[in-house]
């Protein structure tokens, strides 16, 4: 019995110390292709911050259209798209309706709101319709501006409450 136990312990010790060598290969790949970069933004968490559409400061009533243009968070200029490759690249930009879906700025201290619109041209004739893609084309290696202009209609009626009015658009 002692011989059997000794033999079992020797075999068990041998099995524990036995190592098997396994070799193989892993393929490693990279494909670099035509791509585009968006300029004029900063990243905050996992969200790009493209800039601010700042209509400035006014009294509770105003007679003229208030206008603004998005100033890039990174450069102070327009958002831009630059693509590499040899062919022109089409891309689209859509802008949502903001936090209340109707493009209104809300007073941070009351329920008062001010309606606004956003456009892709300085004349404010080409409206960014809510969630409707606008097409742009970029030429190889050249930055294509993605302008965002804003307008607020005159308010000659009931004065708006004093305070800050804010909204956030997703582009």
Model-derived regions, located:
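Short beta-strand and strand-turn-strand segments in soluble, beta-rich domains
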Residues: 123-132
